[in-house]
Amino acid sequence: MTDELSGRRVAILATDGVERVELEQPRGALHGAGARTELLSLHTGEINARQKDIAPAGTFSVDKRVADASVDDYDALLLPGGTVNPDQLRTDPDAVAFVREFMGTGKPVATICRGPWTLAEAGVLRGRRLTSWPGIRTDLRNAGADVVDEEVVVDGQLVSGRGPDDLPAFCAAVVEEVVRALRRS
């Protein structure tokens, strides 16, 4: 455990249907580096997690509705995947606006699996290089992204990972890039 991110806040934007490990493991890595995380969602209370999109996998307590959140309060943003989670986020105007505004700040944004769907909806992928779950790559290319099949891709402020099998490398890259961005600021 280190304290490189002590005092820093990371927003995690997710809703019902989030892939449990894609929220839990990056959050754990950020906590291990000293960061504080807040779970933003479409509603208050709890969100239901899934395992491999099918099996119920417990719940996570929501800290704040995304409609009530400000990008100024956070040093980085994490967009975990699952199928249902980003599918709901990309149809919510508040979630899409939050993601678009966050990308506009230049602060780190990390996304894995199907999480980039929300970035595509926000219109912020044109000319960006990233990776994702294979099933959404055509959507990302249609949004103007250069999509590659790699474990983890870092393109400026954007850190992306393919899926659950790549979580160790993704988590390490997320912490590294947030630390690097904070050193530059």
Predicted regions and their residues:
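Extended, subdomain-level signal for the structured scaffold at the beginning of enzyme domains
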Residues: 1-105, 109, 117-129, 137-185
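Catalytic nucleophile serine of serine hydrolases
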Residues: 113
